[in-house]
Regions:
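Short, acidic/polar
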Residues: 1-11
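Metal-dependent phosphoesterases centered on the DNase I-like endonuclease/exonuclease/phosphatase
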Residues: 13-16, 37, 109-197, 201
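Active-site metal-binding loops of divalent metal-dependent hydrolases
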Residues: 22, 132, 229
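Structured beta-strand-rich core segments of catalytic domains in phosphoester-bond hydrolases
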Residues: 22-23, 28-96
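Conserved beta strand-loop-helix elements of the APE1-like EEP
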Residues: 46-62, 191-212
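Active-site beta-strand termini and strand-to-loop segments that position acidic
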Residues: 56, 81-84, 207-208, 233-237
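Surface-exposed cleft-lining segments at the edges of enzyme active sites
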Residues: 67-69, 94-110, 146-149
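Surface polyanion/phosphate-binding segment centered on an Asp-His-Pro turn
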Residues: 218-237
Length: 237
């Protein structure tokens, strides 16, 4: 990881950093972040997918992936940390690919994630974050009219996110800012970021019992270094 990443890490000074699509194995990471516990879930295929969490607080337990991975390839997409009052789950949701070639698996994965989150929510509050690879509503991307059949804005993916929220979860950014237009991802093509032709596909979602604890949700679109920018949740726990 680059020196620029370390600078951003220290600048944001968060209690938890959740990273997606790290594309690395733990032995490839050379970071000197004192005071953070580090957790990695790496794909079997090197240089692909993968997730990581850096936490100032030691978790009570750590788990990786779904409990039942029978129908899921080992792509390193999920990390779950348990703390005294809440669970923290980060995920890199599978992309449905061009022409929605992977949509069936994507929807299967979404159903498994709802089951996973609901099983946690029965025990304590849940914070779910990451690259969720969906722009939920038309306000969440620059050009909705031409993207209804594209990965990330298909009716199926949007309905899956609606279903997640209907299970007792809140999109924290949209909860605070129902009409604000900001994006968290821009294609590398056609100078999309320069033109702000973006999508909001990175989220912090929380269980409804945390609604009154939400203080702020931010999209740090002033930070460069990736096709995504960091998103932040400030919550009183």
């Amino acid at each position: 990881m680059s020196k620029g990443f370390e600078d951003i890490f220290k600048q944001l000074d968060a209690d938890f950093f959740c990273l997606q699509e790290t594309k690395c194995q733990p032995d490839q990471v050379d970071l000197s972040f004192d005071g953070y516990y580090q957790f990695f879930n790496s794909a079997e295929r090197k240089g692909y997918s993968s997730t990581a969490i850096f936490s100032r607080k030691k978790p009570l337990s750590v788990s990786y992936d779904f409990d039942d991975m029978t129908d899921h390839p080992k792509e390193g997409r999920i990390i779950t940390l348990e703390f005294e009052k809440f669970y923290l789950v980060t995920a890199y949701v599978p992309n449905s690919k061009d022409q929605l070639l992977r949509i069936d698996y994507r929807l299967q994965w979404e159903q498994a994630m709802v089951r996973h989150l609901n099983s946690l929510k029965q025990k304590k509050a849940v914070i779910y974050c990451g690259d969720l690879n969906v722009a939920h509503n038309e306000i969440d991307l620059k050009n909705p009219d031409i993207n209804h059949f594209n990965a990330g804005f298909s009716d199926q993916e949007r309905e899956a996110f609606t279903n997640l929220l209907s299970n007792g979860y809140i999109d924290t950014y949209r909860f605070l800012y129902p009409n604000k237009v900001e994006y968290s991802w821009w294609s590398y093509r056609s100078r999309a970021r320069e033109k702000n032709i973006g999508w909001r596909i990175d989220y912090f979602v929380v269980s409804e019992d945390l609604k009154d604890k939400i203080i702020e949700a931010k999209i740090h679109n002033q930070i460069y270094g990736s096709d995504h920018c960091p998103v932040e949740l400030d919550i009183d726990l």
